[in-house]
Amino acid sequence: MKKTTALFLLIFSLIACQSLELSPNNNLPFDPNIQHGKLSNGLQYFVLKNTEPKERVYIRLVINAGSMHEDDDQKGIAHLVEHMAFNGSKKYPENQIINALEKLGMKFARDINAFTDFENTVYTLNLDSNNQQKLELAFDVINEWMNNITFLPKDVDGERGVVQEEWRRRLSPMLRIGNKKSAIEMAGSRYVLRDPIGDMDIIKTISAKRVADFYHKWYRPDNMSVIIVGDIDTKQVVKLLKQNLSQENPITKTTLEKIDFNIPLINKWRLDSISEQGTTIPSIELSFFENTIETNTLASYKQELIQQITTRLLNLRLQQWEKETENGVDSANFYRTHLGKETLQSIFSLQLIDTQYSKTIDKLFAFIASIKQQGFTQNELSGEIKRLTQLNEKQLNIRSGSLKIADDLITSVANKQVVLSVNDRYELNKRFLSQITLADLQRTLNQTLALKAKLLLITQPLPQKALPFDVAEIETRWNNVMEMQQHQWDEKKQIEKLPHLTFNTGSLSQEKYWDRGDIYEFRLSNGSKLIYHYSDKTPNQVHFRAVTQGGLRSIPNKDYHLLRAAVSVVDETGVGELSLSAVNQIFSRDPLVIATVIDDDKQGFTGVSKPKDLENLLTLFRLKLRSSPISDLALEKYRRETRDYFKQIDLETQFMQAVSKLRFPNIETVYTQKQAQQLSFDKNQLNNAYQHYILDKTDFTYFIIGDIELNQVKKLAERYLASIESKTQIRHFVPTIIHTPTQSFIMNGLKEPRADVEIYLTADNTWRTEQKYLFNILADIVQEKLRLILREKVSGIYSVNSWFMQDVYAPQIEGKIEFSCDPKRVEELTYLTNQVLDDIIKNGIDENLLRKKLAEQHTQIRREFDSLVSIASIIEESYWQQDNPDAIYTYQHLDQLATKATIDALAQKALKKSGRFVSILKAASY
C-alpha cells in the first residue's frame, strides 16, 4: 500500500537545458525533450526519443483508475478488467491480442503485461523493434484497450478462476502481516476496504455487466495517458498517436467522479501490536504522518533535497547507533514513503535482537532527542554536500535506458508531476546544494518530530504478549526524553584508512586478442590468466571476478555446511584486518564490496566498482587473500540468525527439506543443515576451513569487464594480480546424482487454502554448449502449452513456470514445472499436465509454436547483450566451459540448432515418464 515519493526517487535521476527563474514559488520547468500534449478526445501523451538501447520502444498506457474507484459491489473489478483486456476486444476476440503481438516476437508477461494498484491500471508493451509495422500494431492494440474491450459472459466466467488463483497464490504470513499494518496505518480510509486483488465472493458472482460498467465509466480518454520512450522519430510517433488514438468517447462530456484518497490523520499518539504465524523477528516502527504537499515548485524541490540530506544523515547515525550492543538492535533505518496518494509517512524502523521493547524504545527516543537538541554537525553536512555535489557532476553525463525512463514516467504522469531535464536537474542541484544549511536540516527534522499523528507499532513473535506499557505511558516517556538533556553525539573521530600494502609488481603479456568480441587474454607472470573486455553498457561501472575450480562438491561431504558457514562469517567480519564497519566508513561515499563466491563446482571472489575505484577494490582483494579473521560480533550474529532460522522453519521449508532428501539421498544440501551442528562451529574451525578451502587455492582466472580502458587495466593487473602466489590444490569434483522417486510425495498441513504442485524432470545427458538455448526453448514451449490448458481452458491456475538446465560437469538434465491451485483440483491439473507432456513426446513440437519461441529467444538474447551484468556472466561462462569465447556466439547458429527434430529429440529425453517426480504441498483440510 506504499510507494516511494516520486520526487524523492527522481532527484539525481536522468531524464537538457532551459533558464530557471529564481522565485521559489515558480513552477519547475517540464523537460523540453519530452513531447507532451493532449489529443482532441482528452488523451494525454508523453513521447521521448532515447536511443539506449537502439531500436527498442517502450509503451505504457496509464489509466487513472484502480481499486479505489470501485463501487462497493465491485471490489476487485479494476483488476478483473485488466485481465479481460487480454481476453478479447471487438477486433481481437478471445486471446488474439496476445497472439497478434507474439507473432512479432513479443512474449506475454515479459513484453506484454499490465498491473493494477489502488489508483491506477497500467498496460505495458515492450517492442524489440521500432519498425512501422510493430508501432502500428501496438497503437491498434492500445486503441482496443481504450475503447473496445469486450465482456462476454463466457469470457468473464473463464477469468474468474484465474483471478481466484492469483489471490490464492499470494496468500502468506507476510501478506497478512502487511495487511494488519495497513489496517492500522490507514485506519478510517477507503484504502483498507479496497485491496486491488478484491473480494473473492464478489469475483465469483459479479455479473459481466457490472464488470463492463467499471470499464465504461473509467476507461475514458480524458482519464488516460500514453507514454512512449525509445529509439523513435517523435514527430512520426505523435502523428501515429493522432491517427490511431483520437477516437471520441461521448462520456468525456460528463464530469469525472471524484474519489476520496484521504487517509484521516489521527492527531495523537497511537500504540499497537501485531503478530502472525511465521513472523519470528521482533520489530519496532515509529511513524509520523502528514498530508502531502505541492511538489512542482522550486521551493518544494529544494525542500525535498533538504529532506533527502536529513534522511541520509539520520541513517548514517543509525548505522553507528545500531552497533552499540546494549541497544538490542540488529538493524535500524529511517525513510519516508507515500501512504496512499495524499499522505506521507516518516518511519524509524528497527529490527530487534530480543523482545526488550521497553528498553529499546527508550534508547530510540533518546537517540532522536539528542539530534533534536543538538542537531547535526557541520562536518556531517559538509561531507554529504560534497558527496551529492560529486554525484551531481557524474549524473550529468550518465545515460539512462528507455525502460527505466518509461517506468519512472508512470509515477510522474499518474501523479501530475513535472519531469525535469538532465540539465535543469543539474543546475537546480548545483544551486540548492550550495544554499542548504544546518538550520534547514534542523527545521525539517523538527517539523517531522512535531507532527501530532504518531504511531508506535510493534511486531511480536508468537505467542503475542500484552505490552508492559500503554499509549499514555509512551507519550509521557517521549515528552520526558525530549525535555531531558541528552549526551553529546560522539562523531567517532577515528578515521579509518586502507592499510598500505607492499608487494612486488609482476608483469603480463598478451596471448590473444579476439577481434569478434573485442576480448583480450593476458598471461600474468604468476601463471594466471586475465580476461578483459571493454563495455559501457552500464557507464562508469566495472565488474571484477577471480574464479578457480573447486566449490562445494570438491570437498568432503562432512565439510559442506562448515565451509558455507565459514564464508558467511568471514565476509560478515570484514576484509582481512579491516572490519566491515571500517570498510563502510572508508568507502561511505562510493561503497565497495569484495565478496567470496562459492558454487558447486567453482569458487573465488567478486566485486563491482567505478573505474576510478578499481584500484581500491583490488586492494581489498589483496587484503582478503592475506587473512580471514572472524570477529565475535560476526560469529554471534551468525549464531543468532541460525537460531532464528530454525525457530521459524515453516511447513514450506519442511516440504523442501523432505523433497531434497528424496531427490538427493545421502548428499548434503542447503536443506540438510542441523541446528546443533551449525551452532557448534567455533572460530578455529571456521577460520581453518576458510583458510584451507578458499585462501589456499588461488590459481585464479581473472575477469575485468566494464567501462575501463585497457592501459589502466594492464597497470592495475601488473601491480595487484600478477604478483599473487598461485596456490593449487588437487580436488576431485563429485557431481550430484539426482534420484527420481517412483511414487509421488504429498505433504499436508499448509495453512493457506492452496496446493503447491512441483513436477521435477530428470534425464541422463551429456552436456553440450548449445543446449542452454535449446533448454530455454523447450521450457517456453512446455510453459505455453500448459498455460493454454491449465489457465486459458480450465481456469485452474494463475501462472505456470517451467525450466531446464544442466551444469557443465553434471551428468543429468534437471527440469521443473510448478504451479499453485485449489487443493480440490490437484489431481485434475496434474493429470492434464502429464497429458500435455505425453502429447509432446508422442506428437512432437508444433512448428509454428517453435518458430514463435525461437523468435522470442532471439529477442531475449539481444536484451542480455544490453546488460553489463549479463555480458560479464556470458564471457565468464564461455571461458569456464571451454577456455575461450567461442560459446558466446552459439546463439548465432540458433536457427540451425533449434530444429524441430532437435527439440523433439530433447523433449523425448527430458519429458519421459520415468524421469518425472511429483511433489505436492497442500492445505490440511483437503
Curated annotation (Swiss-Prot):
Residues the record lists as binding Zn(2+): H79, H83, E159
Pfam family name, one: Peptidase_M16
One GO-annotated biological process of the protein: proteolysis
Cofactors, names only: Zn(2+)
Name of the protein: Probable zinc protease PqqL
Catalytic residues in the record: E82
InterPro entries, alphabetized: Metalloenz_LuxS/M16, Pept_M16_N, Pept_M16_Zn_BS, Peptidase_M16, Peptidase_M16_C
Co-factor binding details: Binds 1 zinc ion per subunit.
Gene from which the chain derives: pqqL
